[in-house]
Amino acid sequence: MRTLFLTLVLTANLYAQNDDYFQQGVAYAIRATLDDQRHILHARLDLTYDNNSPDTLNRMAFHCWPRAYASDNSALASQLLRQRNTDFHFAPPAARGDLDSLSFTVNGQAAEYLEDENHQDIVWLALPEPLPPGESVVITTPFRVKIPESFSRLGHVGTSYQMTQWYPKPAVYDRKGWHPMPYLDQGEFYSEFGSFEVALTLPRNYRVAATGTLKTVSEDQWLRELAITDRRRLEARQDLEDYFVTEPFPESDPERKTITYSAENVHDFAWFADKRFKVLHDTLQLAGRSEAVDVWSFFTETEAAYWMNSTAYLKRATRFYSDRVGTYPYPQVTGVQSALSAGGGMEYPMITVIGLTGSEKDLDQVLTHEVGHNWFYGILGNNERDHPWMDEGINSYYEWLYLREYYPEAEGDFDFLRRPIDLNYFGYRHLALRGRDLPPDTRSDSLVDTHYWISAYSKPVLALREIAAFTGQNALEDAIRFYYENWKFRHPGPEDLFQTLEGILSPALGRAFREAMTSRATSDWKVQDWKPGEKSSASFLQLGQRLAPATAQLLAMKAEQPATLMVNPGEEYFADDLPLSLGVELPAALNPLDLYLHNNRRGDNSLRLNLLTAPERPGGRQIFFIPLLGYNEIDRFMLGGGLHNRTLEPKRVEWALAPMYSFASNALVGFGGIRWRIREPFPFARQLMLSAGSQGFHDFSFAGENYNYTRSAVRADLTLADHPITERHRQLSLQWINLARFRPGFDPGGNLMGSIREVNSFFRLAYVQRKEREINPVAWSVRLEYKTEDVTRNSLLEASYLRLDTELRGAYQYEPERFFRWRFYGGYFLVNALRERASYPNTALSLVDNANSDYAVDGIFLGRGGGGTYAQQLETRQGGFRAPISSSFSFGRSNDYLVAVNLDATLPFQPERFPFGVYLDAGTYGFRPTSSEPSRGEFRWVGGFSVTIMDGQIGAYLPLISDPDTRLLLEQTGGLAERISFRISLTNWLPWKWIDEVF
């Protein structure tokens, strides 16, 4: 009775709050003819538009989304480049699409239209007469669609057609006005509910799958007979493939057919046509409806072994959502396997299209997700562009429930070192721990790939799992079922869902979910205390920014089942008289939005030692071991092991210790460090990283003795807050380096007497900014460096200096994966006691960036002795010359200034797998041959061929042309092989950099 009362009150409140709600009406009649020789669709639209608003309309916004494929000026083209997809950018005009031949009439009167000022795929139709409330108009126009190749959702591959968002479509008009939106690859749509009558004319041997009910009896009968025949043939075959198959297209039948479809209560119409389709059919009887649902699947030879079971998956998914959300209301459900360039699957009313999947389970999962969109998108027609989480997030939660029910053995999305990885959980934590997450209620056109996945899909799933753990699964499903029944075939917004959860579950839970969806506030529950005993007790403290529920679990003795208790939101919560247990834990599975796990367990919290790494566990007492093998010129092979605490996810405090034994030096070498990650230390900053570390290896050999160095550094990196959509990254750094080198010592007579310690300290202040665009990325940096004087050594070469370094680099992608790259560098000593001297220490500016000029040991070089093959390893700092000139020469060194330019280009006529290129380096610098001579400007240049991979991280460079002085020095290095320089940028090979840069 209480539940019924609450439901009635909530229903009354919801309707009272939405008494100004209205919804426009649309009825489409479309006739279209496919020309599959020219990939053109000729069509006519007759649209009846009902103005149910209280406003008089003078104009209407229409989406002409195929126009997004017409040029590089569309929002689609820009977004594809942000997604690092250049296929459309480099596509020839013949491969692109368009929508033209519009000629609008309104109630028989000609009507003018204008293209939107900002978007070529939106037009504004001026109504000849105002459309008052409660009235209707009939709008007609011919239109022609030039079908693009498959770059996103609409397109064709050969004569396989994916016809989606293909017709002129009015934008939604609601309480907030018109909602025109450009077509996007990532970011879906918002459309009016209505009816469709669509007649398609095309060659007779096409098999068509579409939204709605097929009204052409002969075509329907043909497909049903075909489904019986195809199933028999497929069941008899032993050669069905489970991978991509290149399947030829049959010739089109010269005879044409016209087939008609109708659909009610839908807001879109999609169709797919392919002469190669195999067809399967089944029916599904559901509780709550008298007529069976027709279940269809259309697929090619590609992954046919998996698609043999597709109708069973479709039936199971449709029943699952019907039981848990609401009975499926449409007459049919269809799955199509076809070309798809926008994600793994895409939903439309009653029909979904799926690309390659890779396994039966993955096919089942993707089909289930897309079928689920019939409820969360098809029936609940929220604004997907403004609030993508409302359909993707909630639907992904039900997909997660489906997988738990039908694949209980699959604990995660994949296994890493035999440990299950939940990608929703892992992905959210990886972004949030580094301050890179965004609120789920962010417009989809403001999200880049990873953020779209985490914000629209992952975090809403975790927030709903958090609520279900607290209230129980049934209570949450009841609330969503109520929301569904209240808003089906309408346009709910976030507030409607929040109010439902607040009313059905509790105000606190509703507010917690609201905050999780609309903010970046984090939750952090801590097990403050736990006291063992026959009646143990525990206290919990809320440290996070977000008011959130938590669910704790007792660690039971032996075979006893763990007991679960609920922890309400608040500053602190005490629990007394708990059953006997080994401890208490806030499990990650029950508290998936709790960001910091190190404080989530008390009691049984033993230290664990694992190999390599693992996901973080509550309590955080984990140490990992990594076997290490190293090599350098002096130490030769080094064997050791690394201990660290870095889990797959970033941690607040991370440390590593990696001792190794050098067999050549008979000594311990290695490195170690610690860093502290502070999330959002200031309103303008995303992250502050404080780090300290030390390393020690041998880098010099003399008279049979190896001499070592020790480099210690402390650093602070402040990453500024830039929205990911800007593609801009800014970082401010402060660093102190102390470098101690041991070198042979000599008495006044020149006799070797032990070793001496050379110490240098450097202070650096730097700013770096990058614009990571796909076609023309650019980055610049400025660094101020102060070197302290080594007072223990009486040498002018150890004097202090103040130096300014600037760098500007960029690239232009002129063909797919073929770049022209450029770099400018300028260095100047603001203060330098050696400016008037002809002595050039390794701290001097240098055209060649080799081990000798790496004076602060910033890079990783295989050898630092300066000779042999090791001297051919170069980097691209300072002058960046790709010429292995010996550091024993004063070539390219300056105590005053240095300016250089580095150019290289990938050759346009080469195969992609062999990235040959050409390069040219040039520079000028201030040089004194002797201290008594005035400084003069020297100009040097060198050019040649290159082979590079991994975006230039690995490369080989052969100098072929140069100025005379440079040529002479190159000839002195030896033959052709000795003149080749190579680059192996080892600092970018650390595994954590790979993982962190993915997210």
Label each residue range with its predicted role.
Residues 15-42, 157, 510-515, 613-617, ...:
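N-terminal, polar/Ser/Thr-rich
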Residues 16, 25-26, 48, 261, ...:
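Hydrophobic alpha-helical and helix-loop surface patches within well-folded domains
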Residues 50, 85-159, 243-254, 258-259, ...:
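A surface-exposed beta-strand-loop module
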Residues 72-85, 144-196, 216-219, 283-285, ...:
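Glycine/proline-rich low-complexity spacer/linker segments in large multi-domain proteins
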Residues 173-174, 178, 187-368, 397:
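Hydrophobic helix-coil surface modules that form long, contiguous segments used
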Residues 209-210, 272, 509-510, 523-587:
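Beta-strand-rich binding/interaction modules
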Residues 561-563, 567-569, 576-578, 586-686, ...:
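Outer-membrane beta-barrel initiation region
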Residues 629, 671, 687-707, 714-719, ...:
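C-terminal outer-membrane beta-barrel translocator/porin domains of Gram-negative envelope proteins
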